[in-house]
A protein has these predicted regions:
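Intrinsically disordered, low-complexity linker/loop segments enriched in Gly/Pro
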Residues: 136-158
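A generic local secondary-structure boundary/capping motif
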Residues: 2-3, 12-17, 53-56, 90-92, ...
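Glycine-rich oxoanion-binding loops at beta->alpha junctions
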Residues: 39-59
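N-terminal amphipathic/basic leader segments beginning at the initiator methionine
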Residues: 1-40
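General beta-strand structural signal in soluble alpha/beta enzymes
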Residues: 4-7, 15, 38-40, 94-95, ...
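Conserved small/polar residues in nucleotide/adenosyl-binding loops
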Residues: 172-174
Length: 174
């Protein structure tokens, strides 16, 4: 075990950063859909498709989770991941359609710039594309991916990961 989320079989992580804008993207995905859960807190949480991660959701799985800087602009990263998954034929099957299920959350890491586009493509789409191509069972912690521009008022943040094995119990109810 590497004490990373990728210790869970089938989970891969990809990261990409843009040093010019002090922002980044982290993607969790894999060859198959996986089960995840969410607890959204705060009054201004920037999220997309987190409802499908709630325990009462009828779907119960996702094709990817995208964590991004960029505040609301960063939600664009999940659209790129959804496009890439669709190109691979992945997604929730509805009749003749596939709908890749991508949940995402963003942090505020914007610096002094209002030009977050290259050739009319948002930098978060570009970063998502790079991160998706970097999917691996090994990734760096700290100021990488979505954690690249993370900070509080006075303390630099980053991304972390951990894993733990829990022995499953068999319960019999009589």
């Amino acid at each position: 075990m590497k004490n990373l989320i990728t210790d869970i079989e089938g989970i891969l992580v990809g990261c990409a950063e843009d040093h010019r804008f002090s922002t980044g993207v982290t993607i969790l995905s894999g060859p198959n859909p996986f089960t995840a859960a969410v607890d959204v807190r705060g009054g201004g949480a920037g999220t997309r498709e987190t409802e499908i991660l709630k325990l009462e959701s009828s779907i119960g799985r996702v094709d990817a989770i995208v964590l991004s800087g960029g505040s609301a602009f960063g939600l664009d990263a999940s659209s790129e991941v959804q496009k890439l998954l669709l190109e691979e034929g992945k997604g929730y099957k509805v009749k003749d359609h596939s709908i890749p299920l991508v949940s995402s959350a963003v942090i505020f890491d914007l610096i002094q710039s209002d030009n977050y586009w290259e050739n009319n493509v948002s930098i978060w789409r570009i970063l998502a594309n790079k991160a998706y191509k970097n999917l691996s069972d090994n990734f760096l912690l700290g100021s990488k991916g979505a954690g690249y521009g993370a900070n509080t008022a006075t303390v630099k943040g980053g991304q972390g990961s951990a894993s733990s094995e829990v022995e499953l119990l068999s319960l019999i109810h009589i």
